[in-house]
Amino acid sequence: MRRYSIFAVAREALRYHSGWEKAWASPEPKKRYDVIVVGAGGHGLATAYYLGKVHGIKNVAIIEKGWLGGGNTGRNTTIIRSNYLQDPSAAIYEKARSLYEGLSQDLNYNVMFSPRGLLMLAQSEHEMRGYKRTVYANNLQNVETRWIEPKEVKKLVPILNIAGPRYPVLGALLQEKGGTARHDAVAWGYARACSDMGMDLLQNTEVTGVRTEGGRVVGVDTSRGSIDCGKLAIVVAGHSSVLAGMAGFRLPIESMALQAWVSEPIKPTIDVVVMANLVHGYMSQSDKGELVIGGGTDGFNNYSQRGSWHHVEETTRALIETFPVISRLKMLRQWGGIVDMTGDRSPILSKTPVDGIFVNCGWGTGGFKAIPGSGFAMAELVAKGYSPLAAEFGLHRFKEGQFIDESVAAGVAH
């Protein structure tokens, strides 16, 4: 496949862009693959990519019941950060953030990574103490964060109301290397790279069953026929429990809707990501000028990709007190995705009771920011049976009580 470059853009401009190749192939499924990855979102595609790049396993199929990146990867608010409290969390998220820095060059695809900085506002004494604790922990974890006072917060975000009577800003945790990336580009870049390595991307192919023999996986049944495999990676976010049920085991997760919405485009107003966990809201500005706003999960289990209007009202009302200038903006569109929540708000990257089946799920509200690190660790787990990054995120922790409590760092998810 031809590499993208400024010279390729110039060449295609001269011939009216008629010579671009398809970014990825759409082949018919083969009878057997060494590894089948179910889920062509960011995590599934990254897993396949690092299986090929790092471990040399290229006889891989990525199966997607819909279209590539049509799940949570294309429905999130694109925030990237690694300022987590617990050591295992900080390690995998910082690995992801560092991979994002060079991902455009690695994939030869511009993922539009923008390390614009990220603020987590402390709007109560409790939050202030908690964020200072996180800063101290991050310093020990080699994650660059620092505490800043209200005056510096106001300097970074002039439109912020730091002296509101209900939600005063007492300071903020700042991660200057945090930021955003283009979610579609991340999925498309990984898909293109996987296809270039000879992997098969099977869209509109629903898995209807998992076949096992003697306690080991041997293949899957799909809407396009049966496919044999040596190993199976389940990477389907909110539908992980459905696939696990097909294989005969249960997962300690629950699925909920998480939604986001954007305003009409306005001139550049805010050039950092701002998270206000006390009011369950966060906001950034897109390249097109839209204010991208996210809120909390619905308070009940569901598989709706719409969310509920009361969350829009509650979050917007609280953010207006924090950012009064946005009160007259119109909402342009709203959408939702299905997030998979664990009890300790940390992910699951693990072997399963069925030999040869691996699961990557439970990322909750933090899935997009973890894509490269998650894929790197999952690929190592599938290829070698063990990954240092994934070791503490196994299913065993729920049986043994070795929880990785990230209910505070997860922000809007607790």
From Swiss-Prot:
Disulfide bonds: none
Free-text cofactor note: Binds 1 FAD per subunit. Binds 1 FMN covalently.
UniProt keyword annotations, A-Z: Cytoplasm, FAD, Flavoprotein, FMN, Nucleotide-binding, Oxidoreductase
Listed GO biological process terms: tetrahydrofolate metabolic process
Chief localization: cytoplasm
Species name: Rhodobacter capsulatus (strain ATCC BAA-309 / NBRC 16581 / SB1003)
Protein name per the record: Sarcosine oxidase subunit beta
Top EC category: oxidoreductase
Any Gene Ontology CC annotation: cytoplasm
Residues with the Tele-8alpha-FMN histidine modification: H183
Gene of this entry: soxB
